[in-house]
């Protein structure tokens, strides 16, 4: 799946962008994020708009100069967006990250008139997530909606007791996660009707009355896939047998092209898997226990800083800064079911991609803000 040289280059790139948020002051971070959101938002707005249009028209195109497939992809009877010839989980996470950036920019923007295009872009990214048909990212997005609701409740409502805050968190999770997840089904049904109207107008003028719209509904059995984690359970279960069969992986890991040779012998599936579908297990397989401990320590520190920033009452931290914890939480959750960070997750055209770089850019910003108001975490202070 990856090349060893890509892993090394990726870590240097990620370390560089992580340091960006740590070396800048608060004002510089804000300006940096404004330009970052603008660049990412414009690129993926154009990409998403083009992909949605060609999808609704049931067509596809090849983009120069490489002739990259762009538009409609129909595996397993699912019509989903194909953006730059990537799979649906990669494309949908792109749009998820840009959606989170629009949420941040909405609260960071002081000019109300500029919030209108931000909202339009955010709605398009939300729609694109639904049309990519990645249930992992749909669940992540639904959880992010609940996190945003919790932030808004803590900001505009007064809760003096801990049990009240816990109750708000539970209510937001219980109501908004299933409702947000269901909203993607409603969007798919709506877009199916829009597709039928568009196609009938385009082809009706040519005298072809037999055409119909694209069926964008998801017919997969959600309960069955949840019960077996879409076959991920077998992959996770192969971890310990793999280490017993090839114990040297515990200390030195394995070469990238040999990563799944042993695990696949314990998996019953028609197609061999190419990765562990969990970034922590993937890191362990690639680097062994030493690399795993380093990554686990970084993730633990990051999560603690995220929680601190999310719940802080420090007046120097506004709602916009707190929303930056949402995409980090979403990408970490996504990484429990896919590979996205620390693993050179880009395709053969590049050693990494926007998902991994964005994670470390945002992580650096969050660590910087948290360090400004609390240089040392309480549990890490020296006695």
Which residues does each predicted region cover?
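Hydrophobic, aromatic-rich transmembrane alpha-helices
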Residues: 95-110, 146, 290-313, 363
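Long extracytoplasmic/lumenal interhelical loops at the membrane interface
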Residues: 223-287
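Alpha-helical transmembrane segments of multi-pass inner-membrane proteins
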Residues: 31-67, 85-155, 328-329
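Transmembrane alpha-helices of multi-pass inner-membrane enzymes
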Residues: 145-146, 324-383
